[in-house]
């Protein structure tokens, strides 16, 4: 939550790089559902002009939400080993594209939005990490506040799909809902702390260090599940 509040990104990546070491990855994805929904809703609604962002990126938002909802229906049937590998690949993709500043000439055209939404949903439904959204929003070269709002909106829509999907698949039940709400409360506290210290941090230094940690943990997940 503190990372999310200070940098605007990285919440699912940080959590999914750590939790699968201790619990089943499907459970980790389930526990993230409500925190992703709430923290990203808080993020994009705090930026002036958010109604216009919804109108501009509605196709991407709907695409990622629907795709995640569908994919989550099958996550309980996928062996944990393969989910861990997908999580690891998602973490590596997320960290490397950010570290290498990999950019593609992106467009707000609905076809681009649908492609980004579907690819993010396929990864996000299994790992909660939606690296294509980061590649897309960075490639659009948006002003900082607009970038935070667009990324927050798309992750928020992914959170809706994840929450509804885990409910539909009975992964989010009485016990896991309570645990997810506890995680949400902790994340929101961290989010507020991060927002307060944002101006005191060197975004570049902190972001780079975190990305290297995420890369290392992603590699660890893949190697331990392949060997």
Enumerate the predicted regions with their spans.
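Selected transmembrane alpha-helices and immediately adjacent juxtamembrane segments
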Residues: 1-22, 103-151, 158
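A helix-boundary/kink motif common to multi-pass secondary transporters
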Residues: 24, 79, 83, 143, ...
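Transmembrane helix-bundle signature of multi-pass membrane transporters/permeases
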Residues: 29-36, 151-158, 214
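Selective hydrophobic functional segments
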Residues: 30-80, 160-204
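Transmembrane helix exit motif
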Residues: 40-50, 72-73, 77-80, 84-110, ...
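Cytoplasmic-side transmembrane-helix entry/capping segments in multi-pass membrane proteins
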Residues: 53-63, 84-88, 108-117, 146-153, ...
């Amino acid at each position: 939550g503190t990372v999310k509040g200070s940098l605007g990104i990285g919440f699912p990546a940080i959590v999914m790089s750590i939790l699968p070491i201790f619990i089943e990855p499907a459970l980790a994805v389930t526990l993230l559902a409500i925190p992703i929904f709430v923290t990203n809703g808080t993020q994009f609604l705090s930026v002036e002009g958010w109604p216009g962002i919804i109108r501009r990126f509605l196709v991407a938002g709907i695409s990622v939400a629907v795709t995640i909802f569908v994919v989550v229906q099958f996550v309980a049937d996928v062996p944990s080993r393969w989910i861990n590998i997908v999580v690891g690949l998602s973490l590596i993709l997320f960290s490397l594209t950010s570290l290498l500043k990999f950019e593609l000439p992106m467009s707000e055209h609905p076809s681009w939005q649908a492609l980004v939404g579907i690819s993010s949903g396929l990864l996000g439904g299994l790992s909660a990490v939606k690296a294509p959204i980061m590649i897309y929003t960075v490639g659009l070269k948006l002003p900082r506040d607009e970038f935070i709002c667009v990324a927050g909106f798309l992750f928020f829509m992914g959170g809706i799909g994840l929450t509804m999907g885990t409910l539909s698949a009975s992964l989010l039940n009485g016990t896991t809902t309570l645990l997810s709400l506890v995680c949400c409360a902790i994340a929101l506290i961290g989010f507020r702390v991060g927002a307060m210290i944002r101006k005191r941090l060197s975004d570049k230094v902190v972001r780079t260090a975190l990305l290297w940690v995420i890369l290392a943990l992603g590699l660890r997940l893949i190697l331990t599940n392949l060997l």
